[in-house]
């Protein structure tokens, strides 16, 4: 597994976990429209609250799978592709809301990292990392 791919994989995953846990109820300056938290942001997009929880749970699951992919490489590519697809949706929602690029730059960044991870990592024929490889990361 390429070091650049591993960095992209881990960075994308940690970024998503940060947004959906520590920054969930915070005004970040990157929220859609004038939203001050995640609930308001989904309202700006015209999406109901249950959609927010479904999207959040899926993104957290994909990000977690990407982290596990550091030890079980074969799950990296599907998780990375899934996260990249969700980021396309996030970018689309920002565009729909008329947000300037600055507000969806984080979504573009995570999309780029997840796509890079999907391209470089996750060869389905690659065996699981050995204990020595895991410890050397």
Residue ranges and their predicted role:
Residues 1-137:
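Short amphipathic, positively biased membrane-proximal segments
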């Amino acid at each position: 597994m390429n070091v650049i791919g591993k960095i992209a994989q881990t960075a994308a995953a940690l970024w998503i976990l940060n947004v959906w846990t520590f920054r969930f109820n915070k005004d970040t300056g990157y929220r859609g429209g004038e939203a001050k938290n995640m609930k308001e942001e989904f309202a700006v997009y015209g999406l109901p609250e249950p959609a927010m929880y479904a999207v959040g749970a899926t993104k957290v699951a994909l990000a977690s799978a990407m982290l596990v992919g550091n030890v079980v490489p074969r799950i990296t590519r599907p998780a990375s592709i899934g996260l990249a697809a969700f980021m396309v949706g996030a970018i689309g929602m920002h565009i729909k809301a008329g947000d300037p690029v600055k507000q969806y730059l984080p979504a573009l960044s995570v999309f780029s990292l997840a796509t890079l991870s999907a391209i470089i990592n996750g060869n389905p024929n690659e065996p699981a990392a050995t204990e020595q490889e895991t410890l050397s990361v």
